[in-house]
Amino acid sequence: PLAQVTVVAPERNRSGASNSLTLDVPLRVAEYGPRRHFVNGTPTDCVHLAISGLFDGEIDHDMVVSGINDGANLGDDVLYSGTVAAAVEGRFLGLPAIAISLVVRDGRHFETAARVASEMLLRLQRAPLHSSMILNVNVPDLPYERLRGLKSTRLGHRHRSAPVVRASDPRGRPVYWVGPAGEGADAGAGTDFHAVANGYVSVTPLQVDLTRHAAIDDIGEWLGGRNE
């Protein structure tokens, strides 16, 4: 086999959970079969538990694969994505990590994304990348045979999301739904949006450091020249 897989997943959909950890209530884990567990927490909780003590040293993890997410994680999505956040947590804990998402349209070709994930694992086994790098992989919703290949990409950028939707609960009180994500704004050649739209698997290298290093001196001047 390619690998021995241990599944630790949220017990329900936690889309948009980002990097949140559950700190104010205890987490409960249910076992649904050999090496298959569900947690009443976030994707980040799942990875943290799996690597940091859930198995009491019985399992030696060497990689984190998050997904397959039912939907795109392109551009700004990575800031909100629980799928990407789970991979980031794996990197925090010192393991190579991949986030896999299927850009679902109509066909829902999860078998395509699974095959791409297997190929990515083989590549990493043969030529490991530095553990500080996280790969964000988005797979077009196509039969595998129709994929045009893989592309190394950068994150694009979306238009702002649609306005919130106001509704009423059964008691007539107002409730609000967050509007859907905006379409691609920066979606030209070289972006993850462009690759997927043209039938390519997008592979974007991510890092945790959000510092805008080129602006450090500019901010020092803005602060009055004090950059001590």
Question: Which role fits each region the language model picked out?
Answer:
Residues 13, 42-43, 69-72, 142, ...:
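Short glycine-rich anion-binding loops that position phosphate/pyrophosphate groups of nucleotides
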Residues 1-53, 60:
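A cross-family phosphate/adenosyl-ligand binding-site feature
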Residues 58-61, 97-99, 127-134:
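Short, structured loop/turn "capping" segments at alpha-beta junctions
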Residues 91-113:
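Glycine-rich phosphate/pyrophosphate-binding loops
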Residues 112-228:
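Electrostatically charged, flexible surface regions
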Residues 9, 40, 66-69, 100-101, ...:
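Short beta-strand segments
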Residues 72-81:
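Glycine/threonine-rich flexible loop motifs
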Residues 86-90:
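Hydrophobic/aromatic ligand-binding patch that stacks against planar heteroaromatic rings
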